[in-house]
UniProtKB/Swiss-Prot annotation:
GO terms for cellular component: cytosolic large ribosomal subunit. GO terms for molecular function: rRNA binding; structural constituent of ribosome. The modification N5-methylglutamine is found at residue 160. Disulfide bonds: none annotated. This is Large ribosomal subunit protein uL3. Part of the 50S ribosomal subunit. Forms a cluster with proteins L14 and L19. It holds the Pfam family Ribosomal_L3. Belongs to the universal ribosomal protein uL3 family. One of the primary rRNA binding proteins, it binds directly near the 3'-end of the 23S rRNA, where it nucleates assembly of the 50S subunit. GO terms for biological process: translation. The keyword Transport does not apply. Keywords: Methylation, Ribonucleoprotein, Ribosomal protein, RNA-binding, rRNA-binding. Methylated by PrmB.
Amino acid sequence: MTTPNPGQRLGLLGRKVGMMRIFTDDGDAVPVTVLDVSNNRVAQIKTVETDGYSAVQVAFGARKASRVTKPEAGHLAKAGVESGELLQEFRVSAEVAAECKPGSQLPIAMFQAGQQVDVQGTTIGKGFAGTIKRHHFGSQRASHGNSRSHNVPGSISMAQDPGRVFPGKKMSGHLGDDTVTTQNLDVVRVDEARQLLLVKGAVPGAKGGFVTVRPAVKVKLKKGAN
């Protein structure tokens, strides 16, 4: 396992289109998630001298001018960039930041087929959920003396000592709507004409949800590689 320089992890913002399957030359079916990463534009370059750190601010998507606050509209107009639905920073090295210019487009060609990437998204919200759905608890007995305690978690603490419920106890509560990163997904295909990335497997979030695609930070070596 190798770890690339974190300063080189400039990525792309996108939207989850959905899942499908494609077939390899050998006839194997591969499940893939289609990501739309079109129109990623540089909104600002941050440097150590002016901001205390190096970063590239990227805008994605389109938004009506009436839906943009005046400070953000002025900030984007300074770089000559149209307003977007998403505005996010990527912490990079000074060398990488120097290669980007405000108003320029980030090419999808920065990713290649066979490369491993980390995809971050917001999981689907499930609302208030019980312990069976939230923590995969098992149900209690359906009969044999069990009365109205089929799906309850059971005891949540001990006795007078310690006399409290320990923090972190698995109980009912809100499920989903979390920021999750799925690591080491293989890029199966890069469609430059339609600005689409096809990555193997599932990606966090619902259709239409925003995602962030970065080069994998924990690259797994293929079998047989030195």
